[in-house]
Amino acid sequence: MFYITYKSDGTTACKKQISLSRLTEVGKTFKTPIYKNLEFAFTTSTYSTTGNTYVGIHSKKNDYIEPYCNLTVNLDMQLGKGLAFIDVNNADRDLLLFLEEQGFIAPTGVTMPSEFVVYPLYRLNLNKIGEYKF
């Protein structure tokens, strides 16, 4: 069995038990040379305010799945399908480089400042990202 840890109300940690057979039917995971003891997968959705693509990364270690980081950030502008600003302020730089090398994301050369951070716009390989889910 696997357990997903999440915060149902923003403060209270909850666990949900999921069978291994159910997880393996859904998708696959990837590993990085940086974090050899973790497996990763993606979560996708859309931001309600702009309709832009949201991508989150979850990690699995010792049968526990938990949120690792938000790959994307929602800035106040609508983007085309498969485009997203990458959260370079909170996501691990080495992980972002790995995702780029593996073809999950590709830089466009466009950036957008927001507060004290300049976010790069990336093209998302949504087909490939969609294969890697818990």
Pin down the residues of each PLM region.
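OB-fold ssDNA-binding interfaces and closely related basic DNA-contact patches used
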Residues: 4, 9-62
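Short, compact, well-ordered microdomains
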Residues: 88-134
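Short non-domain terminal segments
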Residues: 28, 33, 38-40, 66, ...
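Acidic, aromatic-enriched beta-alpha/helix-loop junctions
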Residues: 53-103
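Short linear motifs in intrinsically disordered/low-complexity regions
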Residues: 10, 38, 71, 75-77, ...
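Residue-identity detector for glycine
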Residues: 9-10, 27, 51, 56, ...
